[in-house]
Amino acid sequence: MGCVQCKDKEAAKLTEERDGSLNQSSGYRYGTDPTPQHYPSFGVTSIPNYNNFHAAGGQGLTVFGGVNSSSHTGTLRTRGGTGVTLFVALYDYEARTEDDLSFHKGEKFQILNSSEGDWWEARSLTTGETGYIPSNYVAPVDSIQAEEWYFGKLGRKDAERQLLSFGNPRGTFLIRESETTKGAYSLSIRDWDDMKGDHVKHYKIRKLDNGGYYITTRAQFETLQQLVQHYSERAAGLCCRLVVPCHKGMPRLTDLSVKTKDVWEIPRESLQLIKRLGNGQFGEVWMGTWNGNTKVAIKTLKPGTMSPESFLEEAQIMKKLKHDKLVQLYAVVSEEPIYIVTEYMSKGSLLDFLKDGEGRALKLPNLVDMAAQVAAGMAYIERMNYIHRDLRSANILVGNGLICKIADFGLARLIEDNEYTARQGAKFPIKWTAPEAALYGRFTIKSDVWSFGILLTELVTKGRVPYPGMNNREVLEQVERGYRMPCPQDCPISLHELMIHCWKKDPEERPTFEYLQGFLEDYFTATEPQYQPGENL
């Protein structure tokens, strides 16, 4: 069954490896969305450096998940000397505009122009029609990217999150790029036993010099497809045989259409407000549609909340921030009342989710995982030299599968309301704000770290207001004198120690979000090997 070499010798144990440790937390990264996608590259110099440190430059992601320092050129590789690579649809897609093509999973395309990055001009071989298609909905025919089980540049933690989703049986699996070894892959499998219950095991797939693949040298394969076929028929030393590929969620689009990619000021008439989701100090949030067919979230701001000119300038930066733990900005209406159009998150704010929703029943592992997701998004903001300024559970949105995304980043500094700009006014979130920011207006990524520590208390207390029994003035005075919130009930000491670390008086002594992400992702697994040795491999 595709096995190139099988040697009759004692099974070799796979080397236990780790991608890193808590002291090397840079190895801990969330990958892109399950289907690799191309984001046009942009230099971080286009985003003002609000912090006093230098971050690494941004890189473009190639369309199949690799890293490239420049954006996609539009040149397609050839196959068989034909000069044309055919692509196949991985999902159904319904056209949003007259420029798009609707298509069904399995439909094949000839790509006519791929210079638009996220949107390619294509001709359907089924209908003969031409139009734009989202590039992360297709893959080359017969490539591993077209396989149901291939998830590309997906991080270890996100792989576990997807495999452990409700409804996946033991033996659900996926293959992803290795985070540590270039050219290698990782096989991740959902397993179960009496001691651990449901959990995920990871096996490294190594590449031979001649192009083959193996988990153990006893069984080598010419292709990943042959490897999957082999282990689908027998466990052969794995924790169990491969039963079914993990379900891929629909890939995220970073723009509403090919036209709004560059021209994302849209007419108010193209938006329909359908259901009010929330009402805040500065406006409302609605579930709505764009063009009558695309579900979006629409934040409407009260006139006078911020200058339209300042907002548009900030939105130029916000639009460039693209990460799967940040709520994606799609478009704006910049004339008052200002409308901000973003991706829709079905479960609403984390605060409401914890207090009144499904979040009331969540246990510590789920809560720590949600904190890790927020830290991952903030680590990206940290790398891009940006600042949130208003990080709290009310500004985190929740989607299906307990996915968390950061919203409203950067907007706080634009608010012109006197009750807010006074910083000690009634509308200012004193209880979440670092003392140097509340007293002197010194907002940096380190003041965001302080706020993250407060957000951790919201998670473990299921949405309790910080500093219970104290008003804003008392909080400012007590914190300046060195007071810090005690360990909440049922909160592990180690997690409270992390909060205290976030609340160091000297901002430079607070941890980075990169460290916080690694610590929280590994909170329950720090003593386990990164890769499984296998039993009889």
UniProtKB/Swiss-Prot annotation:
Principal subcellular localization: cytoplasm
Domain of life: Eukaryota
SH2 domain mapped to chain residues: 149-246
Region: Disordered, residue numbers: 14-35
Residue span(s) of domain Protein kinase: 271-524
Tissue specificity of this protein: Isoform 1 is highly expressed in the brain, isoform 2 is expressed in cells of hemopoietic lineages, especially T-lymphocytes.
Activity regulation: Inhibited by phosphorylation of Tyr-531 by leukocyte common antigen and activated by dephosphorylation of this site.
InterPro entries xrefs: Fyn/Yrk_SH2, Fyn/Yrk_SH3, Kinase-like_dom_sf, Non-receptor_tyrosine_kinases, Prot_kinase_dom, Protein_kinase_ATP_BS, Ser-Thr/Tyr_kinase_cat_dom, SH2
GO molecular function terms listed in the Swiss-Prot or TrEMBL record: alpha-tubulin binding; ATP binding; CD4 receptor binding; CD8 receptor binding; disordered domain specific binding; ephrin receptor binding; G protein-coupled receptor binding; growth factor receptor binding
Residues covered by the SH3 domain: 82-143
This protein's record includes keyword Transmembrane: no
EC primary class: transferase
The entry's keywords: Adaptive immunity, ATP-binding, Cell membrane, Cytoplasm, Developmental protein, Immunity, Kinase, Lipoprotein, Manganese, Membrane, Metal-binding, Myristate, Nucleotide-binding, Nucleus, Palmitate, Phosphoprotein, Proto-oncogene, SH2 domain, SH3 domain, Transferase, Tyrosine-protein kinase
Traits of the deletion mutant: Mice have various neural defects, including defective long term potentiation, impaired spatial memory, hypomyelination, abnormal dendrite orientation and uncoordinated hippocampal structure.
Alphabetical list of SUPFAM superfamilies matching this protein: Protein kinase-like (PK-like), SH2 domain, SH3-domain
Modification sites for Phosphotyrosine: Y185, Y420, Y531
Pfam families the record matches: PK_Tyr_Ser-Thr, SH2, SH3_1
GO cellular component, one term: cell body
Substitution effect: C3S: Abolishes palmitoylation and plasma membrane association. Abolishes plasma membrane association
Annotated ATP binding sites: L277, G278, N279, G280, Q281, F282, G283, E284, V285, K299
Lipidation positions, renumbered (N-myristoyl glycine): G2
Active site: residue positions: D390 (proton acceptor)
General function of this protein: Non-receptor tyrosine-protein kinase that plays a role in many biological processes including regulation of cell growth and survival, cell adhesion, integrin-mediated signaling, cytoskeletal remodeling, cell motility, immune response and axon guidance. Inactive FYN is phosphorylated on its C-terminal tail within the catalytic domain. Following activation by PKA, the protein subsequently associates with PTK2/FAK1, allowing PTK2/FAK1 phosphorylation, activation and targeting to focal adhesions.
SUBUNIT field: Interacts (via its SH3 domain) with PIK3R1 and PRMT8. Interacts with FYB1, PAG1, and SH2D1A. Interacts with CD79A (tyrosine-phosphorylated form); the interaction increases FYN activity. Interacts with TOM1L1 (phosphorylated form). Interacts with SH2D1A and SLAMF1. Interacts with and phosphorylates ITCH, down-regulating its activity. Interacts with FASLG. Interacts with RUNX3. Interacts with KIT. Interacts with EPHA8; possible downstream effector of EPHA8 in regulation of cell adhesion. Interacts with PTK2/FAK1; this interaction leads to PTK2/FAK1 phosphorylation and activation.
Similarity remark: Belongs to the protein kinase superfamily. Tyr protein kinase family. SRC subfamily.
This protein's name: Tyrosine-protein kinase Fyn
Source organism: Mus musculus (Mouse)
